[in-house]
Amino acid sequence: VYKRQVQVPHYNYVGDSILGYKSHMGAGSITSNVKSDKTLVVVKDNRDSGEEIETGLKKFGAMLGDHVEVGCNSVLNPGTVICPNCNVYPLSSVRGVIPANHIYKDADHIVAKKEK
């Protein structure tokens, strides 16, 4: 599902995903929608709560909030949630939940954006 003004312009694959208003997928970035072991997709909150949400689905890609920027050649693994106003560095492999207003550099470096 694409909301208004979504940009997926170059050699992307978006499978079974929701892309928010004015989100942008850089060249070659994909939303993977099936786990390699073919089990049901679970959304795992990798923040403090550690909550898990069972989707009951074998095919479930990613959910991107409004104004999300995904860098070139990034992979959003099944069940990834990227909250609004986030940036994902190029060549990233993202999984879990990325909180709003953050920059995903790699799995160990997810930093809050500085207010302007």
Regions found by a protein language model. Name each.
Residues 3-116:
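Glycine-rich hexapeptide-repeat left-handed beta-helix
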